[in-house]
Amino acid sequence: MRLSARNSAVGTVVSVEEGAIAALVRVEIKEPFTVTSMITKDASEDLKLKTGDKVAIIIKSTEVIIGKD
């Protein structure tokens, strides 16, 4: 996956908490660092995120984006 954003990392999903419209996703990028991102419930379901998944996180000035191959 190639992106224009320069602030990115690879990590492991440690939790996914789905609510009615959003999901709170915690990604461990390097122990003890964890990044938390709120994404839409639709995005969480589309990515089929679950604990243990390897994901890429992209950090922009106003948001954290999560991607999965």
Name each region found by the language model.
Residues M1-D69:
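Non-catalytic connector elements of ABC transporters
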